[in-house]
C-alpha cells in the first residue's frame, strides 16, 4: 500500500513539474519569437500558390484511371476471391491429414 502511495505521489510531483515548466503568459500577452526563426528567404511558396499556372494545364483524363475508386469492389470481399482461398485451404488440409495417417 505504501508503494502505491509513493508511486502516486511521484506521479503528482512529475505532473506539477511539467505544468510549471511550461511558459506562462498573462492574459493578452503575445509570445515573442526569434526573428531568425522566420527568415523570409528560407520560406518557399506552395506549388499551387503560383497564379501563373492556370486551370488549362489540368488534364481530366488523368482521373479516368481512378474514376471508379469509390464504387470499386474490394478484392478482399470479392466472393470469387473467398471461394478460391477456401478451396486452397481445403486442398492443403487433406494432404496434411493423409501424411499423418501414413505414420
From Swiss-Prot:
It comes from the Eukaryota. Increasing concentration of NaCl decreases affinity for thrombin. GO terms for cellular component: extracellular region. Its main location: secreted. Residues 91-103 have a biased composition (Low complexity). Residues 1-21 form the signal peptide. It is found in: Secreted. Residues 74-77 are annotated as: Blocks active site cleft of host thrombin in a reverse direction compared to substrates. Keywords: Blood coagulation cascade inhibiting toxin, Hemostasis impairing toxin, Secreted, Signal, Toxin. Residues 24-103 are annotated as: Disordered. Female salivary gland (at protein level). Not detected in female midgut, head, carcass and male tissues (at protein level). Residues 56-68 are annotated as: Blocks exosite I of host thrombin. It holds the Pfam family Anophelin. GO terms for molecular function: molecular function inhibitor activity; toxin activity. Belongs to the anophelin family. Does not inhibit host coagulation factor Xa (F10), factor XIa (F11), factor XIIa (F12), kallikrein, chymase, trypsin, chymotrypsin, elastase, tryptase, cathepsin G (CTSG), plasmin (PLG), urokinase-type plasminogen activator (PLAU), tissue plasminogen activator (PLAT) and matriptase. Interacts with human F2 (thrombin); the interaction results in thrombin inhibition. Salivary protein with anticoagulant activity that inhibits host thrombin (F2); binds to the proteinase in a reverse orientation (opposite to substrates). This is Salivary thrombin inhibitor anophelin. The lineage of its organism: Eukaryota, Metazoa, Ecdysozoa, Arthropoda, Hexapoda.
Amino acid at each position: 500500500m505504501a508503494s502505491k502511495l509513493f508511486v502516486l505521489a511521484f506521479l503528482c510531483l512529475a505532473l506539477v513539474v511539467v505544468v510549471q515548466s511550461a511558459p506562462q503568459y498573462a492574459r493578452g500577452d503575445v509570445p515573442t519569437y526569434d526573428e531568425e526563426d522566420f527568415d523570409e528567404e528560407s520560406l518557399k511558396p506552395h506549388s499551387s500558390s503560383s497564379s501563373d499556372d492556370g486551370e488549362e494545364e489540368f488534364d481530366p483524363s488523368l482521373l479516368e484511371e481512378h474514376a471508379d475508386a469509390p464504387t470499386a469492389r474490394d478484392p478482399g470481399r470479392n466472393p470469387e476471391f473467398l471461394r478460391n482461398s477456401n478451396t486452397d485451404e481445403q486442398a492443403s488440409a487433406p494432404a496434411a491429414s493423409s501424411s499423418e495417417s501414413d505414420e
